[in-house]
Amino acid sequence: MKIIARNKKALFDYSIIERFEAGIVLKGSEVVALRAGRANLKDSFVRIIKNEIFLLNSHISLLHTTHSFYKHEERGARKLLMHRKQIDKLLGKVSIEGYTIVALDLYFNTKNKVKATLALAKGKNLHDKRETLKKKQADLEARAAMKNYK
């Protein structure tokens, strides 16, 4: 499993409830760009439109070798492939309980297919974010102390 892009900001801004795997509908030039590692999920989000699920605002850069006829939209909407039951479950959680769906990472699976890890998440408050930073800092200090102890 080769990870192409990771959304680190999502792990900081949201508390993850449940993770899902989804396939992505891509054009050939997009797959070539992903193989070169030219993807960014920083400001991306997932929406359900007419019972179909889309990854919006994800950035896949163009390669300079791509012919102008085959160029793709860098920030276009990309359809995600999931089972109907999973989409219905996500739709129910998002509409009723106020959760959001966030893309965590893009990767190539063992069959060289591009997959996305999605998460059902709840937004963190400012004090939750501060608490996360404090935990992270405490872990770093503990590791440093253990390293110096040896």
Curated annotation (Swiss-Prot):
UniProt keyword terms in alphabetical order: Cytoplasm, RNA-binding
Location(s) in or outside the cell: Cytoplasm
Q: What name does UniProt use for this protein?
A: SsrA-binding protein
Give coiled-coil spans as residue ranges: none
Function of this protein? Required for rescue of stalled ribosomes mediated by trans-translation. Binds to transfer-messenger RNA (tmRNA), required for stable association of tmRNA with ribosomes. tmRNA and SmpB together mimic tRNA shape, replacing the anticodon stem-loop with SmpB. tmRNA is encoded by the ssrA gene; the 2 termini fold to resemble tRNA(Ala) and it encodes a 'tag peptide', a short internal open reading frame. During trans-translation Ala-aminoacylated tmRNA acts like a tRNA, entering the A-site of stalled ribosomes, displacing the stalled mRNA.
**The gene coding this protein:** smpB
Q: Which GO biological process categories is it annotated with?
A: trans-translation
One GO term in the molecular function aspect is:
RNA binding
Question: Which Cys-Cys disulfides exist here?
Answer: none
Enumerate the SUPFAM superfamilies for this protein.
Small protein B (SmpB) (SSF74982)
Pfam families from the UniProt entry: SmpB
Which InterPro entries would you find in this protein's record?
SmpB (IPR023620), SsrA-bd_prot (IPR000037)
- Give the UniProt family note: Belongs to the SmpB family.
The superkingdom of the source organism is Bacteria
Q: Name one GO cellular component term.
A: cytosol
